[in-house]
Swiss-Prot record:
Residue numbers bearing the Pyrrolidone carboxylic acid modification: Q39
Biological classification of the source: Eukaryota, Metazoa, Spiralia, Lophotrochozoa, Mollusca
Function: Neurotoxin with probable activity on sodium channel. Induces intense repetitive firing of the frog neuromuscular junction, leading to a tetanic contracture in muscle fiber (spastic paralysis). In vivo, shows the same effect as the whole venom when injected on fish. Intraperitoneal injection into fish induces a period of rapid swimming followed by a spastic paralysis with stiff fibrillating fins. At high doses, the peptide is lethal to both fish and mice.
Family: Belongs to the conotoxin A superfamily.
Domain of life of the organism encoding this protein: Eukaryota
Protein name: Conotoxin SIVA
Record text about domains: The cysteine framework is IV (CC-C-C-C-C).
Organism whose genome encodes this protein: Conus striatus
Endpoints of the signal sequence: 1-21
Residue ranges annotated as propeptide in the record: 22-38
Tissues expressing this chain: Expressed by the venom duct.
């Protein structure tokens, strides 16, 4: 088998594995929809409740006692 033939076989194998391993948009949208819905509910709780989680955050102490005004 010559070098050109081996290179052609290599390219065909790479192309075949790329086509097989790439998911279609239709199949991946159903799985990602549940993750995106769950993320929306998690983000505000992380942003609004900073007291007690990390002492290095830039949260003013009055937010912990709800006395900011």
């Amino acid at each position: 088998m010559g070098m050109r033939m081996m290179f052609t076989v290599f390219l065909l194998v790479v192309l075949a594995t790329t086509v097989v391993s790439t998911p279609s948009d239709r199949a991946s949208d159903g799985r990602n929809a549940a993750v995106h819905e769950r993320q929306k509910s998690l983000v505000p709780s992380v942003i609004t409740t900073c007291c007690g989680y990390d002492p290095g955050t830039m949260c003013p102490p009055c937010r912990c006692t709800n006395s900011c005004g």
